[in-house]
């Protein structure tokens, strides 16, 4: 029985590409690298976030983008995160800050999420992950919705704006796209 269990685990590992294993599974499309707060603020500024917006952060990690969207910009926000421990951390932070009425943290894959309510979508994913997500964005998002990507472009889309931000010795690119103006 033990040999069968080991064989099943080995087979499951082989069924998932090595790049996906590195990030914890086939649905996890990027490593967990928290966005520095200066970039969080700048991404939301570049998107022109206002209190009437609904900000979706795909791969929301510890919740810093959705929390900032609610606290500093007055927006409603939804964070979608695959990793349960990060969801728990984000939910705890949201509760501690009294933002439960403005921020929702959803545990699951953003590849299967309904993005239709979003007026702003934030991303800090790899270019290949953005490519995999692009059909969902094109299907779900209405014209005028702003998509902001930190460091990694969405291939085949024309950005409305490209902003360079320096943090210490690193230089970051913030890509702003507007649905309906990406071609």
Residue locations for each model-derived region?
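Conserved SAM-binding motif I beta-strand of class I
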Residues: 76-81
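Conserved alpha-helix/loop element of class I SAM-dependent methyltransferases that forms part
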Residues: 34-52
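C-terminal substrate-binding/active-site "lid" region of AdoMet-derived donor-dependent transferases
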Residues: 128-183
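Bacterial N-terminal signal peptides
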Residues: 5-15
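Glycine-rich SAM-binding Motif I of class I
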Residues: 63-67
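A short SAM/SAH-binding and catalytic strip from SAM-dependent methyltransferases
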Residues: 116-132
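S-adenosyl-L-methionine
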Residues: 84-117
């Amino acid at each position: 029985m033990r040999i069968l269990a080991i064989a099943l685990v080995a087979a499951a590992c082989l069924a998932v590409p090595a790049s996906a294993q590195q990030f914890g599974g086939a649905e996890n499309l990027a490593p967990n690298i928290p966005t520095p707060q200066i970039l969080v603020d700048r991404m939301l500024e570049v998107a022109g976030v206002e209190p009437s917006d609904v900000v979706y952060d795909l791969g929301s990690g510890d919740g810093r983008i959705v929390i900032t969207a609610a606290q500093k910009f007055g927006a409603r926000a939804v964070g979608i995160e695959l990793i349960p421990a990060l969801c728990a951390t984000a939910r705890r932070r949201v509760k501690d800050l009294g933002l439960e009425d403005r921020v929702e943290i959803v545990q699951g894959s953003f590849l299967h999420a309904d993005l239709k309510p979003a007026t702003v979508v934030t991303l800090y994913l790899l270019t290949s992950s953005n490519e995999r997500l692009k059909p969902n964005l094109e299907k779900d998002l209405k014209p005028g919705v702003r998509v902001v990507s930190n460091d990694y472009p969405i291939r085949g889309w024309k950005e409305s704006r490209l902003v360079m931000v320096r943090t210490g010795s690193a230089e970051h690119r913030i890509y702003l796209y507007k649905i309906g103006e990406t071609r």
